[in-house]
Regions:
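Short secondary-structure boundary/capping elements
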Residues: 108, 116-119, 182, 186
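Glycine-rich hexapeptide-repeat left-handed beta-helix
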Residues: 5-11, 129-225
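Short hydrophobic/aromatic-rich motifs at helix boundaries and adjacent loops
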Residues: 68-69, 85-87, 119-121, 183
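Conserved short-loop catalytic and cofactor-binding motifs
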Residues: 36, 86, 104, 138, ...
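A generic local structural motif
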Residues: 68, 86, 104, 175-176, ...
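Terminal amphipathic alpha-helical/low-complexity segments used for targeting or macromolecular assembly
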Residues: 1-73, 78, 206, 210-211, ...
Length: 225
């Protein structure tokens, strides 16, 4: 295993401004600037998800009752299908032609673009999911941003918390070093068309470029690359 590189020195330290330029959601998700999230396209993904409930509430205020069935802080597009037994907790927006299966659990401020699928037993927490992405079944995705056409096979997980160590702060890999996000809860940013095989795990802080494939049963941990 290669030696862990932690960015601490003045030479290798990436300041906040450089991080925002280097880790842009728009570099991973092509359609973000034309989406409802366009105003936040220049945020880092951890900035976006760290305030997910309020951001979803802001989007809720702009929706039309003509197209969405709104109940409290939950909005479901009239073309979406939500099966009996799904658990929905607001704030939450479910977009056009989405399918939410029985046993799915959505909570903590989530936004789903069009044609998304959240399968049986899948849990989505404080996350933003772009068009055509699918959580097959028995998945967990926490505090994450998934690009368009992302697919998670059965049992694949995106972890959002470093419970294995005393310092819970999540790091991301930028260039040849690690950068602290300053957050204790951040899962991953998955670019358009990324794929996670069955029972694969992405550790907190993953930044997966468009088209990345993580094989079945594999662990991707940016701190061990």
């Amino acid at each position: 295993m290669p030696a862990l590189t932690v960015v601490e020195s003045d030479v290798n330290f990436y300041d906040e401004k450089e991080i925002k330029v280097t880790v842009r959601i728009s570099d991973y998700i092509h359609g973000v600037t034309q989406s409802a999230l366009a105003r936040w396209a220049n945020l880092t993904p951890w900035e976006l998800v760290s305030d997910a409930p309020e951001r979803v509430r802001e989007l809720l205020r702009q929706l039309s009752d003509e197209h969405y069935q709104v109940s409290g802080d939950i909005a479901v597009h009239r073309t979406a299908q939500v099966e009996d037994g799904a658990i929905l907790k607001g704030p939450l927006i479910i977009g056009p032609d989405c399918f939410i299966a029985a046993g799915a659990y959505l909570r903590g401020g989530c936004w789903l673009d069009e044609h998304c699928i959240i399968g049986p037993g899948a849990e989505l927490k404080s996350s933003f999911v772009f068009a055509g992405s699918k959580l097959a079944h028995f998945n967990f995705v926490g505090d994450s941003v998934l690009g368009a056409g992302v697919n998670l096979e059965a049992g694949s997980l995106i972890a959002n918390y470093r419970n294995e160590r005393a310092d819970k702060t999540v790091n991301v890999r930028v260039g040849d070093g690690l950068v602290s996000t300053g957050c204790e809860k951040f899962g991953a940013l998955l670019g358009d068309g990324a794929r996670l095989g069955a029972n694969a795990v992405v550790a907190p802080g993953g930044l997966l470029r468009p088209g990345t494939v993580i094989r079945r049963l594999a662990l991707y941990d940016c701190e061990e690359v």
